[in-house]
Amino acid sequence: MKPTKRIKVKNGIEYWYEETPYYDKEKKQIRHKSKYLGRNVDGQPVKMRSAPDEIKERAKPKSASVKSSYDYGSILILQSVMEELKLDHYLESQLPSSEASLVRALAFNRIIRPTAMKNVGSWFEGTALALESPQINLASQRISEFLCKLGESNIPDRFTSQLIEGTGTANTLIYDITSLSSYSKLIGLLEYGYNRDGADLPQINLSLIMDKDRGIPVMYDIFPGSIPDVSTLSGTLKKIKAHGIQNYIAIMDRGFFSLSNLCELAHNGISFIMAAKLQLNDLKHLLTEAQKDIDDAKYLHKFNKDPIFAKPITYKIDTSVVQGYAYYDPKLEQIEKQTLLTKLYDIREELVKVRLKKNSNPYVVFKDKVQGFGNYFDWKVTDDHFDVSIKQNAVAQRMNKMGKYILFYSGNFDAIECLSLYRERDEIERSFKSLKNEIDILPLNAHSEKTTRGFIFIAFLSLIIRTRLITMMRAAGLLDKYSVELLLLQLEKLRKITLADGQMLVTEMTKKQREILQALNLCA
């Protein structure tokens, strides 16, 4: 590793140092040896003790005014993630250099300081990106035009193919879908459907595929808002095949469960793990039969230090037989019971307090208060108030199912391995949360379908970088001290400054900044 020279400013005086990186085998991280070279005199290091008097005179402190200051630290770390995953290479192979830089700027903005597109230019001017790519135009109109161009092109698909090939994605894929709402009336994909956030707005459905082993999203797709999860699987399987991925395990929640999807997965020889949706009568019967002896000690296992029962089952579909496990989790059962009973108690108390007005509709008031739990109550109106009782049979039937669920699978999985892989879906749930909160994708404010597609590609790229950074932070033991946001705030204080005389300096690192970069094996 080559040494680098840098200027450190102490008490307003500039000093030259030579820093040589080396690998510390004991701490398993990159560290630096620092060697003093001398005072900065006209851009050169000078040892003052042996310097002539005229040099000492010239070296007396002068007020060097700072012309500009730029965020360098947070840009450095995100750029290092891009380079590690070769994302910059994939972009530059698909786009002219200026447009690849524009994509990078937009993606970094969603991670560091998500803001309206009209404000991105102001943010960009305060970052080190402005020094590297001063030529890019970040006017609001230019961004909209570029996102539209990106959205109508096949660049996102080509980028995805390169990403999948470059990461060697082939093993375990986690598939899920979420809703993205919008106020716009100009996006053709927007339709009303089941909204996972409870928003009464038209929406787009966004599917995401995560590479479990790399911990990053590798593929996404967009569907009209009215298309249910279960109907998206067939097209997604074809896309996965088109990208050359074979011999993988697909992990899906109950939203994708249907007999046709089970048959298609089996017909294509795809290994999968999928939660069952217990609405079909034969599946209800299957669980009822399984739970008769599911708490037998021979089915007892331990998962995450807690006892759990898992009983092998089979399910016949036409001429095919699907393997599965029926699970009984006593801890989950208790949590679900307490949650339901607390909810029913609170609703009952709220209803008892209600005093009905003369012109009010009791049924409407009741439905508003019970929030979807109406089937658990008997009620009538007496004078101006509700007489309410909880239906014991309804509660007992619901409690009988608590803590119990079925996972179907194809492949060679034991009960705990099957459950462990299914629980990895938490990663994709966190990714959706990042998209909607940290990356600030909602509500969609684009004014056309093409622009929306372009913006979602930017958000997808941001999510790749952010999830990879989280994986790096976890491996380095930094997640106990920092969130992504706090880590980037610490590194924002590492600045590049330009002086009035044209010099460019990097400010001295704080102890926390040095610890972060060393833990991540990065050099400033």
Predicted regions and their residues:
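Dynamic "connector" segments at or just before major functional cores
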Residues: 1-189, 206-219, 226, 234, ...
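Conserved structural-core and active-site-/substrate-pathway-adjacent residues in large, well-folded domains
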Residues: 18, 120, 174-176, 215, ...
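Secondary-structure transition/capping motifs at alpha-helix termini
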Residues: 25, 127-135, 153, 166-169, ...
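An anionic, glycine-rich sequence signature occurring as long contiguous blocks
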Residues: 202, 222, 269-421, 475, ...
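Active-site beta-loop-alpha junctions of metal-dependent nucleic acid enzymes
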Residues: 221-243
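Acidic, metal-coordinating catalytic cores used for nucleic-acid/nucleotide bond scission
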Residues: 251-260, 278-281, 450-452
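Short amphipathic alpha-helical "interface-anchor" segments enriched in bulky aromatics
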Residues: 418-445
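Basic, amphipathic alpha-helical segments enriched in Lys/Arg and hydrophobic/aromatic residues
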Residues: 448-470
